[in-house]
Swiss-Prot record:
Keywords recorded for this protein, A-Z: Ribonucleoprotein, Ribosomal protein
Residues of the signal peptide: none
Database matches in HAMAP family: Ribosomal_eS24 (MF_00545)
Protein name: Small ribosomal subunit protein eS24
Record region (Disordered): 98-126
An annotated GO BP: translation
Database matches in Pfam families: Ribosomal_S24e
Record bears the keyword Magnesium: no
């Protein structure tokens, strides 16, 4: 990431004590460049907010303005990783590499679906 060309700003910083995190809006100005990667943004925001572990930062919901050059998104900084794993949705944890979905076989999924359908018919008759 070229430091001179990219400017990262955080607005509307709120401290959410109930969920043990900081919430903020991230503005990235990147003229003449494609979008900046979230990995680069995490390291920049970690330095900006003096965060020891960049793994506790979650960035999402980025929209690039028409014509490019500026993106706006949302960010969360949790106090520690355990709290982040407790409150973050599983899909965001999976994006960060902190969660893997247990994979069942196709046959098991189909059998479960059919069992549930069968159980639903029995309760509907009564």
């Amino acid at each position: 990431m070229d430091k001179a060309a990219v400017v990262v700003r955080t607005r509307k910083v709120l401290t959410n004590r109930l969920l043990s995190r900081k919430q903020f809006v991230v503005e990235v100005v990147h003229p003449g460049k494609a979008n900046v990667s979230k990995k680069d943004l995490k390291t920049t925001i970690a330095k900006l907010h003096k965060v020891a572990d960049p793994e506790t930062i979650f960035l999402f919901g980025f929209k690039t303005d028409f014509g490019g050059g500026k993106s706006t998104g949302f960010g969360l900084i949790y106090d520690n990783l355990e709290i982040a794993k407790k409150y973050e949705p599983k899909y965001r944890l999976a994006r960060a590499g902190l969660y893997t979905k247990p994979q069942t076989s196709r046959k098991q999924r189909k059998e479960k679906k059919n069992r549930l359908k069968k159980a639903g018919k029995k309760t509907a008759k009564k």
